[in-house]
Amino acid sequence: MAAQLKRAFQNQKLNIKFTLVIILFMMVPIGILAGVIFYLMEQNVIAENKDYMKYTMERSRDAVATKIDSINMTTQFFLSDEALLGMLEAAAKGTPVTTEEWLTFKSEKVSSLERLVYNNPLLYAVRVYAVNDSVQEMMPVLYRQSRMKKQEWAGKENYFGWNFDYTDNIFSSYTMDQNLRIVSLVTPVNDEENEPIGTIEAAMTMENMFPGLYEDIEDEWSCFVTEQGIFYGNETEPFSKELLEQMIDAYDDAEEISTVYVRAEKRNFVVSYMRVRELGGMLLSVEDITENVHKVYFMRNVFVAVMIALLIVIG
C-alpha cells in the first residue's frame, strides 16, 4: 500500500507534488491547533458542570443540616417534657393514673406538643410509644407499645437511630398513604435510673429530607447510600450497579464535598459526593454530560474537515 502511494506521488506533476506537500505540512499545525482548542473547550464544559454540581450539593448540605437539626431539636423538646415522662414512667411501673390526670395531661400537654409538630412544616409526625399497652392513647402523640410494633423498623434487632424509606403502618393500610416513604430518628426514653420507659419516633418524608432523590431533572440522578451499602433513591439509575460502586469507592473522605469527572461505559459523568455523618451515609449526585461533550467532539471534527477541504480547494 505504501509503495503504491509512493509511485502515485512520483507520477504526479511537480506543481501537484508541491501542493500536496504544502497541504500535508499545513494539516499538522491545524490538527494540533484543533486538538488544543477543542480540548480546552471540553475542559471548560467539564469545569462548568463540576461547579454546577458542587453548588447543587452545597445547597443540599445546608438543607439536610436544617432538617436534621429540626428533628433533633424536636426530639430533645419531647425528652425534656416532664409531664410526658411522668406518664410514660407511670405506665412502665404500673402506677395508677386517674381519669382527671389523663384529661389534664391531654388538654395541657398533648395539645401543646401537637401544635409544636403541626407548626413545623418539615415534620411528618412525632410519636411517643410506651413500653407496654398500659397507657391511654392520645393521638397524634402518645401510643401503646403494640402500635409501635406495626412499624417496619420495630422488627429490627436495633432500631434506635435513623431509619430510612419505610411506609407508615401505625394504622390500617387503608387509611395510610402506602406510597409515602418515611425517614425517622428513633430515640429511647429512659427514667432517672436509666430504665426504658418509652420510644420517640420523629419522622419526615424521604422526599422532604432528600428532595434531589425525587426530582425529575433530565440527565441528573441522585441517591443516598448508608454505611451498610444500602441504596435509597430512584431505582432507574442511568448506569450499572458496578459503576455506581466504583464511584463510591473513589470518594475522597478527606473532603466534605468531592466533585469528579468520570468516563465510563462510553459515557461522561460529573459525580458529586457528600458525607452526611449525622445520618451515617453519603449523598451522591450524578450528571450525565455525554451529550455536551460529544457536541465538542462533533465541532472539532467539523472544523478539521472544513479546514482540510479549504486547503484542497486553495491548493
Give the positions of each predicted feature.
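Extracytoplasmic/periplasmic sensor domains and loops in membrane signaling proteins
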Residues: T99-L113, M139-T175, D219, N234-Y261
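Extracytoplasmic/periplasmic ligand-binding sensor regions of membrane-associated signaling proteins
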Residues: Y118-M204, G212
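Cytoplasm-proximal transmembrane signaling helix
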Residues: M282-G315
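Extracytoplasmic
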Residues: T175-I200, D216-E218, R263-M282, T290-E291
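Extreme N-terminal signal-anchor transmembrane helix of membrane signaling/transducer proteins, especially
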Residues: M1-Q43, A47, D51, I308, ...
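Intrinsic low-complexity, intrinsically disordered coil/linker regions enriched in small/polar
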Residues: N208-L283
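Solvent-exposed, extracytoplasmic
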Residues: K106-Y118, E193-G233
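Extracytoplasmic/periplasmic sensory segments of membrane signal-transduction proteins
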Residues: D51-Y159
